[in-house]
Regions:
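Phosphate/pyrophosphate-binding catalytic cores of soluble transferases and nucleic-acid-acting enzymes
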Residues: 1-209
Length: 209
């Protein structure tokens, strides 16, 4: 159509999947595998997962048992059913990344979390549960939903919820940085900018050379 598409935000995995042409297949639950993993402690689960999918740990939450078991389930299925093969890239992407000093990034993460909580995210999770979404389902929606759900169940205090979330989101951001560096090694160069410089980004878009 002669239009320039923009893909903004999201995780490194989302961007990588678009640029490298992943085809994702639904992965069924594996009851026998889950039963076998029941006796594994967290460290054993991590080692097992990384042994079958070494390059995935930057995008996967290795701190939560259920998510880690699901990641193993997906990795095992993908190994036996290689349906997520890569297609050749039909585009020449221009990837722009915003680079911030570590302390500034941490400050922004904390501020964003405070803003979301003050804007009513706790009430949103409570409302979803009141409408019939069970706690297990809510915890699968992401970090914020997981720990807000635990707070609403009186498993942790408000302060514990905030501190855990702040730490986990920072850890996730660090893993994303590692993922983006890996994209460059895989042939997807990223043009890094010091902060959100809109004019510099516009110049780069208009004249990528």
């Amino acid at each position: 159509r002669g239009k320039m598409p923009f893909l903004v935000g999201g995780t490194g995995l989302y961007l990588d999947s678009v640029l490298r042409g992943y085809r994702m297949a639904p992965v069924p639950l594996n009851a026998s595998l889950r039963e076998r993993l029941t006796g594994y402690d967290m460290e054993s689960l991590r080692r097992y997962f990384l042994s079958i999918q070494r390059d995935a740990h930057n995008s996967t939450d290795l701190l939560e048992r259920e998510r880690l078991i699901r990641a193993i389930e997906i990795a095992e299925f993908s190994r036996d059913h290689p349906t997520a093969a890569l297609q050749s890239i039909q585009i020449e992407p221009l990837v722009i990344g915003i680079c911030l000093e570590r302390e500034e990034l941490r400050r922004k993460i904390t501020l964003r979390l405070q803003t979301r909580l003050q804007a009513g995210m706790i009430d949103e999770v409570k409302h979803l549960h009141d409408r019939g979404v069970n706690w297990e389902r809510l915890e699968s929606f992401g970090l914020e939903y997981r720990y807000i759900s635990r707070y609403l169940q009186h498993k942790i205090s408000h302060e514990e919820m905030f501190q855990i979330l702040n730490t986990r989101i920072r850890q996730f951001a660090k893993r994303q940085e590692t993922w983006f560096r890996g994209m460059g090694k895989k042939g997807v160069p990223i043009h890094w900018m010091d902060g959100p410089d809109e004019e510099a980004a516009f110049r780069l878009i208009m004249d990528p050379e």
